[in-house]
Design a protein with these regions (language model features):
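Membrane-interface alpha-helices at helix entry/exit sites of multi-pass transporters
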Residues: 73-81, 112-124, 151-162, 327-338, ...
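Hydrophobic mid-bilayer segments of alpha-helices in multi-pass membrane transport proteins
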Residues: 2-25, 36-49, 207-217, 226-244, ...
Length: 397
């Protein structure tokens, strides 16, 4: 099946599904679903355009080259560089961007330094998942949660998410360091089997500096109360206009992740249908029987983590969302559905994208390591983060 057909087929099925849903659902419910998904899909499309055009301009390769210089080019210094790249990318550009963008950069940096790339690659995918709570834009589930109306703006969301997000990152970094510290020294033989797909010395793209300025302005805007899709749309318009004037050949529909967007919309609508058939009431009733607020937080997080590893974190979050009747409870569910899916390969789209990048680089995916190390890490990050959430001061419970 060719690339265009792979895009057309899921969207054709989705459009038919949406038409059927609109015909057989109450009008208010359909309008509400469109109002919820519209800004999210626009954000996904525009942030993808910004990222992909910045990649064409060579921005992220230059950042990686600059970061991995001197003592930071190998040993523990390279681990720190990888952590910073993955954490910043996940926070501002989403976990999926980290999987697709940072993974090949890290593999190339590891090859250049003569490192075993697997410890660094595993650290990247862990941070992509366990570092994806701090901002609404860090994860698609966060965006869906913000659109429920339970959060009073971006500032309220960040105040709730900051402490558990920090706890998760601390646990992840500590775990990575303890497990891999002896494997972070470069090998004299290097990694000759790894294809060099990362940073290379080359002439600067004419739009490199403009891309850097656009991204530098965009990132802090994503932390403000300005609607996230306004900021990314403006950034996308600027870069598309600039490339249209200098290099139109890179402006094509593949800049937008159509298939991923179709899957996200389809899963959302499918879960909405399942809820309308009676599951929503069962979910609410089941969790309402918990006697304490703290018990509800831990139950939602645990259920989100387990269900994410059984199916996938997006439908897991959507299935359990009705049980979260406050911003605090919804944050607990996000902790489980964001940090928990690091055990099974299919639990997170970011993990699948990460594995694809490893295969493209000629590496086998270490699924056994991923699963065995993911179990204690998932338990640790989810447990510590929910504990931290329970101590967030001055917020509704």
């Amino acid at each position: 099946m060719g690339a265009p057909l792979r895009t057309v087929v899921p969207w054709t099925i989705l459009v038919g599904f949406l038409i059927a849903y609109a015909l057989f659902s109450p009008r208010a419910q359909t309008i509400g679903l469109i109002g919820r998904l519209g800004p999210i899909m626009l954000f996904l499309a525009t942030i993808s355009i910004v990222i992909n055009l910045a990649v064409v301009a060579g921005l992220f390769h230059r950042v990686a080259e600059f970061a991995a210089t001197g003592r930071a080019a190998s040993g523990p210094g390279l681990w720190v560089v990888v952590v910073l790249l993955a954490a910043v990318s996940t926070t501002f550009l989403s976990l999926d961007t980290t999987a697709v963008l940072v993974t090949p950069l890290v593999l190339a940096l590891a090859r250049r330094a003569g490192h075993d790339p697997i410890p660094l690659a595993l650290t990247v995918v862990w941070i992509a998942n366990t570092g994806s709570l701090i901002l609404p834009v860090s994860n698609l589930t966060n965006l869906m949660a913000v659109e429920t109306g339970l959060f009073d703006g971006t500032g309220h969301y960040i105040r709730l998410a900051a402490l558990p997000a920090t706890a998760s990152l601390v646990v992840t970094l500590g775990f990575s360091w303890v497990v891999f510290r002896r494997r972070l020294q470069p090998s004299p033989q290097g990694q000759p089997g790894l294809r060099n797909t990362g940073p290379q010395k080359s002439a600067a793209h004419p739009l490199l500096h403009l891309s850097g300025c656009v991204v530098a302005v965009l990132l802090p805007l994503l932390t403000t109360s300005i609607p996230f899709w306004w900021s990314t749309s403006a950034a996308a318009i600027i870069l598309v206009t600039a490339f249209a004037l200098t290099d139109r050949s890179v402006l094509h529909p593949k800049l937008v992740p159509w298939t991923a967007m179709a899957v996200a919309v389809g899963l959302t609508v499918a879960v909405q249908v399942v809820h309308s058939l009676g599951l929503e009431g069962l979910v609410r009733t089941g969790f309402a029987q918990l006697e304490t607020a703290e018990g509800l937080l831990f139950a939602l997080a645990a259920a989100g983590a387990v269900l994410s590893n059984l199916i996938n974190n997006i439908p897991a979050y959507l299935l359990l969302e009705p049980a979260a009747d406050s911003s605090l409870a919804l944050t607990a569910l996000l902790i489980g559905s964001n940090f928990g899916p690091i055990v099974t390969p299919w639990a997170s789209l970011a993990t699948l994208l990460w594995a694809d990048q490893l295969r493209r680089a000629g590496l086998g995916v270490p699924w056994r390591q991923f699963i065995l190390l993911g179990i204690p890490l998932a338990v640790g990050t989810v447990g510590m983060s929910v504990t931290a959430l329970a101590f967030v001061p001055g917020l509704d419970r």
